[in-house]
Amino acid sequence: FNSPLAESSIIGTAIGLAVTGYKPVVEIQFADYIWTSMMQIRNEVVTMRYRSNNLWECPLIIRAPVGGYINGGIYHSQSIDGYFMHMPGILIAYPSNASDAKGLLKMACRLKDPVIFMEHKGLYRQGYASSLEPDSDYLLPFGKGNIITSGDELTIVAWGAMVHKTIEAIKSLGLDER
């Protein structure tokens, strides 16, 4: 159903649904606006298991389009991943291509933990981010990485749109030819 464009209300409603047996998937239209809902996320969503000695769960998914490349200025270009990486009690999905997005979202829908699902806006409608799904039942487990190329001189860890920028850099330096 639709809700008012009030991020704290969106998250608060999702919490209520999640703790009563539903699996809400909500969207914060731009991740830049998630900050008004942080009290709900920090004090309710991510601490639910801890506060209840693992008796309660809050299985919700928060979709949050992030990042720049759309000339959106300061209110439509923020990346919130660094903040959430340091918040225990929530899983993070930040896919770099279409099949990973589908596999992670399907997996998130099966979990009993809260997930923040970050979608880099710079990947929307980009041919280089398209990918064939391995099969219709494809699930991508959380906590796994993808090794694009391997070597013994340098390690680069990237996610979202930066995976594609990293691949470009590897090719431009000729490191993919080794």
Label each residue range with its predicted role:
Residues 6-9, 15-157, 162-165:
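Conserved thiamine diphosphate
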Residues 1-2:
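Short pre-catalytic strand/loop immediately N-terminal to key active-site residues, enriched for Gly-Thr
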Residues 83, 165-178:
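Short helix-loop-beta junction
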